[in-house]
């Protein structure tokens, strides 16, 4: 449903940060492992390279770097943070990595938890955090989108291994007056009936416990994806949810300063932009360098564009995330920057 509540305060995005692994793998390098080429990958995805987490790196470590950078931009002390939400489907600890992140940051006053919504995770977490702030229950929140899908990819499957990379991005949210509100509207959707076209399923190994009793010991298979179905889902549902969002907020596409989509495939980015006649100069993309970093793509791109001066305070951004679940969402954001 559209966000229309005015209870409590507004929410301002006052800081951002990002981090990526040191290992960079090019398309040509992947072509040494699987039957593919730079031209084949770029023509179908727009991806030229991706960052892959190394043996001495962790998702929590990347998340810490991104969150610390967001704190620095916002000018906050870690102890002033009330809430930390880590959007990830690939935590270091399946029970949750957000509490470890809280400890490393020194954010002793913050409640911290993971939120899992795959590639939609960052937007879902952003909107969740905003509701805590708007009720007045909390004042400051860190939202981190981070994933290490390289650990769950079949590196011998050229259809999927070329797509994914690792990374982390973070934003700092602060409760503000309604006049400074930076989250102007949102839409969230889920459809589990189509979830089998993109998943990371369990693999079960039979284990005999005691006489007459058995158990299926759990593990996970590599990422399973029907690329054609995911593409059709994205080019159909993303324009539709953005159209609903723009109508609900009485926003004309031409009034947008930027279109910031989940970085999954350049063809999807182009199709959505064309649907709204948004010029390519307004479409933010770093897909070529990083690939699909799942929950990290939107905050990673946001931070890059803020750091290089493309995104300026007061500018209007339409953002949409989509992915496994199936899940998808959209948000209309006005970038604020440090207060």
From Swiss-Prot:
CDD domains: KAS_III. Keywords: Acyltransferase, Cytoplasm, Fatty acid biosynthesis, Fatty acid metabolism, Lipid biosynthesis, Lipid metabolism, Multifunctional enzyme, Transferase. One of its GO terms (biological process) is fatty acid biosynthetic process. The keyword Lipid metabolism applies. The active site is at 119, 262, 292. Its EC number is 2.3.1.180. It is found in: Cytoplasm. The keyword Transcription does not apply. GO terms for cellular component: cytoplasm. GO terms for molecular function: 3-oxoacyl-[acyl-carrier-protein] synthase activity; beta-ketoacyl-acyl-carrier-protein synthase III activity. It catalyses: malonyl-[ACP] + acetyl-CoA + H(+) = 3-oxobutanoyl-[ACP] + CO2 + CoA. Residues 263-267 are annotated as: ACP-binding. InterPro entries: ACP_syn_III_C, ACP_syn_III_N, FabH, Thiolase-like. Its main location: cytoplasm. Pathway: Lipid metabolism; fatty acid biosynthesis. Homodimer. Belongs to the thiolase-like superfamily. FabH family. Catalyzes the condensation reaction of fatty acid synthesis by the addition to an acyl acceptor of two carbons from malonyl-ACP. Catalyzes the first condensation reaction which initiates fatty acid synthesis and may therefore play a role in governing the total rate of fatty acid production. Possesses both acetoacetyl-ACP synthase and acetyl transacylase activities. Its substrate specificity determines the biosynthesis of branched-chain and/or straight-chain of fatty acids. The last Arg residue of the ACP-binding site is essential for the weak association between ACP/AcpP and FabH. This is Beta-ketoacyl-[acyl-carrier-protein] synthase III. The gene is fabH.
